[in-house]
A protein has these predicted regions:
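Glycine-rich ThDP/TPP pyrophosphate-binding loop and its adjacent helix/strand module
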Residues: 54-55, 111-298
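Thiamine diphosphate
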Residues: 1-150, 296-327
Length: 327
């Protein structure tokens, strides 16, 4: 599907809303990781067009699973959950990284609605996503393929793929041909210590091809390209690694591509200039236009409809199966 010019403008506006909502959270907390949030914003607004979840019922059995393997991107996760319509308020975002808040420094299962798994140690979330995919295939044997047909999306970065746990679990995923697993690799070539080539020169694409994965690549700031590879990934008969070539700190004036955005808030002047450049009022914080809020909440509207259709499609036998509720 070709995105129209209106679609592209809408996605750009949504991405900037997401970027600076994250930046404001981190600025208020005076702690966090803005680089990944700014760099992945374009990918995430396009993923919003593909993700099948229902924020009014976070435990819907056939929802897509979304794993943030890089748990340090928590501001991005929380901003999206709020914008998509989960039970996470703007005030919750303003309490980011505060004691007893619903928005801790790293995402925690059973603590924040919409978070699928606790993540933090790099590589762990990748393995969790493989486990989710395996679980869905097992669930199909207990129910049926129509009842369990969701995708598992995992967001990972350079650091995740340097860890042994991601290598081992990727090998298993390829061996089992986990075709509902889509890993989006935020390839920005930067870590907290600087350029990734200081410590890592492996050919990641070649590694995953050898492990029996589909490997796709795109410019992580080109909305049409992101959309196209996501469409292709959903049809793959194997697990897919989607390499999104991104710029860490995208939109941060003077700091794009710099490791300085990895684990420190943007300074006040950079944040002000960056907002101005994105045509956002620099004197205001936590701003979400009604139009953009409506666009993000299309995820919820779609999810409610999809769950209703799913319920109707279940066979009488499947509806009586206790596993429907247990999963």
């Amino acid at each position: 599907m070709r995105l129209s010019n209106a679609d592209l403008e809408r996605l750009k506006s949504m991405a900037n809303t997401l970027r600076f909502l994250c930046a404001d959270m981190i600025d208020k907390a005076n702690s966090g990781h803005p680089g990944v949030c700014l760099g992945l914003a374009d990918v995430m607004v396009v993923l919003s067009l593909h993700l099948n979840i229902n924020p009014t019922n976070p435990k819907w059995l056939n929802r897509d699973r979304l794993v943030f393997s890089g748990g340090h991107a928590s501001a991005l996760a929380y901003s999206l959950l709020h914008l998509w319509g989960f039970d996470l308020s703007l005030d919750d975002l303003k309490r980011f990284r505060q004691l007893h808040s619903k928005t801790p420094g790293h995402p925690e299962l059973h603590h924040t609605e919409g978070i699928e798994i606790t993540t933090g140690p790099l590589g762990q979330g990748f393995a969790n996503a493989v486990g989710f995919s395996m679980a869905s295939q097992y669930a199909q044997t207990l129910l049926d393929k129509e009842a369990v047909s969701h995708k598992v999306y995992c967001l990972c970065g350079d650091g995740d793929l340097q860890e042994g746990i991601s290598y081992e679990s990727a090998s298993l995923a390829g061996h089992l041909r986990l075709d509902n697993l889509i890993v989006i690799y935020d390839s920005n070539q930067i870590s907290i210590e600087g350029a990734i080539n200081i410590s890592f020169s492996e050919q990641v694409k070649t590694r995953f091809l050898a492990q029996n994965w589909e490997v796709l690549e795109c410019d992580g700031h080109d909305y049409q390209a992101i959309h196209d590879v996501l469409e292709e990934a959903k049809k793959s008969p194997k697990p897919t690694l989607l390499i999104a070539h991104t710029i860490i700190g995208k939109g941060a004036i003077g700091l794009e591509g710099s490791e300085k955005t990895h684990g420190s808030p943007l300074n006040k002047e950079v944040l002000k200039q960056s907002k101005e450049n994105a045509q956002i009022n620099p004197d205001e914080s936590f701003i979400i236009s009604p139009k953009n809020k409506m666009h993000f909440e299309e995820v919820k509207v779609r999810g409610v409809s999809l769950e209703a259709l799913w319920e109707k499609s279940l066979s009488p036998k499947t509806k009586k199966n206790p596993c429907v509720k247990e999963f």
